[in-house]
Structure formats: structure tokens, C-alpha cells
Amino acid sequence: MRFLKSAIIAVTVLLTGRVSACAQTADDIIARHLAAIGGAPNWKKITGMKKNCIRMSRGVEIPVTITVLQGKGYRYESTIGGFTSYTIITGTEGWSFNPRNQQKPDALPTESVKLAQDRLDIQGPLIDYKEKGYKITYLGIDDVEGTECHKLKVVMPSGKEETIFIDASNYYLVRTVEKTKANGKEQSQTTTYGDYTNLPEGIVYPMSVDGGLTIKSIEINKPIDESIFAMKK
């Protein structure tokens, strides 16, 4: 009899947990996530960000600088063997340049620029997502390398789809999987986040991205010369 009661209690607890998980909504998960990373008000104060990083490739350290001016420009710059390459995205245009095989920047296809517009958003897709025109669906619980995560599906106005995995215990972002279509082909990109750090501005930020990119320092709301987002002629 005791065994039967214990079994019933165990099953009840298990079912209660599952019902509780299913009962949660996307907005519930988003609210807890935003609270965990410093709160939406602190993130909305950020208008510019410059990240000085190191990317490891075949045992070699590659300096990387990522600069974002909220809603205006994104620039990814890396230096290998004395050659500096970059990719620039603005609200309407984009360019890429690799001095090893180009004499001048190449304009990015219109579709590529459209799909990359979310890079101009420092806040990310979960803050004011409805106002941004995003649609988010809660897909329940999933496992990411042993970590129980809440799974959210984000559909952006550009047509890009992103699946977001949020740690069910601390509500930090663990992984994103982006899906886009280019030239009729579906492409997927997985990004993993870690080493969350409290910054003076009141936000919590992942200093490790994808296991290969480490952020050494972050400059927030420092003056950014907008000319770095223009194509050099």
C-alpha cells in the first residue's frame, strides 16, 4: 500500500510539473528572461555597443570588433595576417570587404540585407517584440546538452525564423538556431551562449559566444563615428 501511495505521489508530481510547464506562455518566459538579464528598461538605455573580441581558429587568435549603433548600423571587423576584413549592415544597404581578394567593397544582395536587419537591434528580439512585428510561440521544454530549456519560436518580419532556448533554471539564453532562405535554399546557423557577466550598466551579458568567440571588453553608449557604417569609395 505504501509503495502504491508513493507511486501515485511520484506520478502526480511529474504530471503537475508537466502541466505547469505547458501552462506557461511565451510572455511568461520572456518576462522572466528579461528580468534575469537586467530588465528591459536598462537594455532600452543602450544606444551603442562596441565589443572587442578574440575568435579562435585552428589554434590562432583572431582579433574581432563588433560595433552596433541601435537601429542604424552594424559592423563586424576581423584581422588576419595583417589584413582587415569587414561586413557592414545598415537599414537599407550592406557591404563586405576582404582585402586579400577584393580591391573595393562589394554590395550585399538586397535579400541578405533584409535578413540581417535584426543585427541592428542591440536589445534582441524579445524586448517589445510585438511592436517590432515579431511573432513568438512557446514550444515547451527541450534539452540542450543536458540543460532543460524553454523553447521559443520567433518569426521576424523579414521572414527569418529563430528558435530560442532559455535555461529553465536561471532564464539565461543558452542557444539560438536561425533559419533563413537564400536563393531558394534553406540555411541554418546555431549559436551557443555562456559566461554571463554583470556589467556596470545593469545588464547581464554573455561573454562567450559559440565556444570560439570570447568578448574581452565591451564599450556601451560611448561615441560611435557613424562613418564606419558607410562604404568607402
List the model feature ranges, each with a label.
Residues 1-2:
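N-terminal secretory signal peptides that target proteins for export/translocation
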Residues 6-14:
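Sec-dependent N-terminal signal peptides
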Residues 22-35, 42, 93-160, 181-186, ...:
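Flexible, processing/modification-adjacent segments and terminal tails
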Residues 27-101:
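N-terminal mature ectodomain segment of secretory-pathway/periplasmic proteins
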Residues 51, 76, 87, 94, ...:
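Well-ordered beta-strand positions enriched in small/hydrophobic/aromatic, beta-favoring residues
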Residues 68-70, 88-89, 138, 166, ...:
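Generic beta-strand structural signal
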